[in-house]
């Protein structure tokens, strides 16, 4: 599952993998498209287990980098976090870090993707948004971007007591921004 970021209109959507490559293309709402690459850092594990535990509200072990083969044959890369009590069936969170296929992250690049109802948190990175959880199938999701990277954090709703509040997401976003390379 590829994830991409937000808009000035406080919108967010998930991207779709392009067959045969590690680039993810965000569905365009307008005429332009945004392309994102996975596996842009040695590790997507930008939060410690303790930091992810504070965000999720349950005890979580340190993350493990993982490759996933998508249905189209492309390979996705992310850091997976598991609840301390539960083993591999306790998958609780994921961080995926992406960067543009060319250039740097810009407002224009972020502007064409979105899901209605996202909350934009001002003053955190280039942009930080929290997706709404309005249906049982929705996962708590936060996206934060700086000029080089887009970090996507997804929590598994059935394995956490409740979605994080804005303050918890903001702490996690700031910790991620500090962990990203300059």
PLM region descriptions:
Residues 1-7:
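Sec-dependent bacterial lipoprotein signal peptides
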Residues 7-13:
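Bacterial signal peptide processing site
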Residues 13-182:
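A small/polar (G/S/T-enriched), proline-flanked helix-loop surface module common
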């Amino acid at each position: 599952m590829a994830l991409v970021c937000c808009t000035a209109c406080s919108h967010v959507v998930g991207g779709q993998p392009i067959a045969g490559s590690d680039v993810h293309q965000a569905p365009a709402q307008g005429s332009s498209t945004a392309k994102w690459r996975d596996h842009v850092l040695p590790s997507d594990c930008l939060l410690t287990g303790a930091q992810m535990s504070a965000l999720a509200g349950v005890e979580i072990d340190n993350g493990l980098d993982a490759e996933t083969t998508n249905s189209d044959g492309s390979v996705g890369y992310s850091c997976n976090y598991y609840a301390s009590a539960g083993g591999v069936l306790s998958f609780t969170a994921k961080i995926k870090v992406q960067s543009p296929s060319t250039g740097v992250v810009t407002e224009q690049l972020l502007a064409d993707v979105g899901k209605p109802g996202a909350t934009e948190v001002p003053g955190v990175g280039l942009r930080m948004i929290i997706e709404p959880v309005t249906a049982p199938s929705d996962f708590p999701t936060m996206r934060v971007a700086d000029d080089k990277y887009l970090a996507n954090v997804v929590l598994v709703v059935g394995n956490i007591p409740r979605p994080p509040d804005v303050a918890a997401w903001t702490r996690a976003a700031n910790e991620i921004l500090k962990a990203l390379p300059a």
